[in-house]
């Protein structure tokens, strides 16, 4: 009886050890955070970035996010023109294949819904970009431009460069 009890105990201990070894090899699946494809940039708007540069005390910022899946730009633009009695007359995304920090480019996408006073804050989203536009944007060939009644060609510009 002692022998069968000893054999039973050895079998039980062996099964427990086997279970521990098997279960210790099973790791809990680690959940990886999804990789965000969204590109982001925070840019400063100034007259010094205009081509040619303009003299203004106006300033602004633009928080730009680009979703390559949807091919859309989401933006938050804040600005203050240099002349408090000036009005904001137009706002655009500019860009082209030959675009750069040192070149003025044509309008790629207009921005609407902005305040027409000398200062404002605007949140918005663009229409879907074409493949060509998306490639230009990602290559740093686009910029934001704010036109005013004081400087019709553009008072504030910010070149879009993603991190």
Residue ranges: model-predicted function:
Residues 2-14:
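Bacterial N-terminal signal peptides that target proteins for export
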Residues 2-4, 20-43:
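Bacterial Sec-dependent N-terminal signal peptides
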Residues 32-69:
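Transition segment at domain starts
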Residues 62, 90-94, 144:
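Divalent metal-coordination and catalytic microenvironments
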Residues 80-81, 96-101, 149-152:
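Acidic glycine-/aspartate-rich tracts in secreted/extracellular proteins
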Residues 82-87:
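A short beta-turn/strand-edge loop motif at beta-sheet boundaries
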Residues 100-134:
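An anionic, turn-rich surface loop/hairpin at beta-sheet edges
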Residues 134-136, 143-157:
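Short, exposed beta-strand-loop hairpins at the edges of beta-sheets
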């Amino acid at each position: 009886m002692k022998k069968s009890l000893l054999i039973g105990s050895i079998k039980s201990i062996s099964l427990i050890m086997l279970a521990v070894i098997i279960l210790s090899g099973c790791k809990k699946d680690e959940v990886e955070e999804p990789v965000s494809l969204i590109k982001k940039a925070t840019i400063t708007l100034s007259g010094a970035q205009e081509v040619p540069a303009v003299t203004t005390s106006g300033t602004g910022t633009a928080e730009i996010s680009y979703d390559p899946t949807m091919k859309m730009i989401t933006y938050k633009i804040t600005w203050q023109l240099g002349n408090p009695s000036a009005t904001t007359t137009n706002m655009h995304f500019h860009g082209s294949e030959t675009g750069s920090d040192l070149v003025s480019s044509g309008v790629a996408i207009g921005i609407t819904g902005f305040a027409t006073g000398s200062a404002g804050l605007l949140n918005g989203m663009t229409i879907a970009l074409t493949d060509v536009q998306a490639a230009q944007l990602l290559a740093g060939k686009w910029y934001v431009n704010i036109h005013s009644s004081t400087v019709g060609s553009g008072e504030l510009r910010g070149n879009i460069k993603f991190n």
